[in-house]
Amino acid sequence: MFIKRITILAVLILEISVVSANRLSLGAEATYSPTLLTVGDSTSLLSDAGISLSISYETERLRYSSFFSFDKGWEHHSFHRFSRLNEISSMAFSSSIGYLIKENLSLNADIGLKLISVGVQPNNIRVLSPFIGVILRKEFFSKENTPNFALFVPIEYTFGKTAKGVSLGIGVGCFFSLPKGEIR
């Protein structure tokens, strides 16, 4: 039921964006984030690498975005004798709103849900956890109707009952923007 509501929300965001956007963007991003994560009674320091697909629409000062991402984590150090986090991956759906601080530089607030998988199938454990984040994003535009690029610094906090963590990362993205007249 919850997944159905999220899907309906994503479709509504897409429909609203087509009608009201000054600019609609489709993008792909890659991130690397050192992460301190606790799942159950296991706490580890991880390197987390991820890829995401996004759709965004913008007004004069604001950007609204939806993301679907997949991440893979590698354990560097466990704070327990026996670690369960040496095999970990996650999928996430999130939405963000960004405010244009100055030309091509924006501050974004992110909220979403993350499905964390720990261990090797078929004995893996899956945990659904909410997260919030802040993203500082700098965009670099090329010619109109060509791919553009962005650098960004995400800070993320996961706060579920079973899974808790914090990460600070760096990322790069490629996005393609369509002027409003070309959306239809």
Features from the language model and the residues they span:
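Residues embedded in well-ordered secondary-structure elements
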Residues: T7-A10, E15, S42-S44, R84-N86, ...
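Cleavable N-terminal export/targeting peptides
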Residues: M1-S25, G181-R184
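A detector of low-complexity, intrinsically disordered, Ser/Thr/Gly/Pro/Ala-rich segments
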Residues: M1-I6, V11, S33-L36, G133, ...
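Short glycine/proline- and aromatic-enriched beta-strand/turn motifs that initiate or cap beta-hairpins
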Residues: S20-S78, S167, G173-P179, I183-R184
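Gram-negative (and chloroplast) outer-membrane scaffold detector with strong preference
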Residues: S54-F149, V153, Y157
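Terminal low-complexity interaction tails
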Residues: R137-S142, T146, I155, G165-R184
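Short, exposed beta-strand-loop hairpins at the edges of beta-sheets
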Residues: G160-T162
